[in-house]
């Protein structure tokens, strides 16, 4: 059993902080002590912009639109994420959550200082993801484990990828 602490870029399964009976899956972008900024749709960690490269647009098969698709690198992890250029950066409906005072919300987005023993999680479909920007930090005791493959995504088999 792999019992290493989550690292930036890892995709983790965790108990949802607002309802621990639910398991969620998101990418770790902030470790305890990090400052995470998502401003004008750009992610920075500890003042350093996350390296990104725009690639081809992603067609949403169930909808009639495309999203910009990027490749990003956090630490040793390279991954793809979607960004809807028409969606606002503003996070209008963030809830009250423990350590919310560690976050500053403005028209450009959010900046948060991750408290000790917690993680900041973001979804790879950035503009359609309810994640730490909305409901706060994930306590270490809520971490279930690291995800390592997509199981039965029948709508888009190409997303399954390969094992490493």
Please name every model-derived segment.
Residues 1-164:
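Soluble "head" domains of membrane/secretory-pathway proteins
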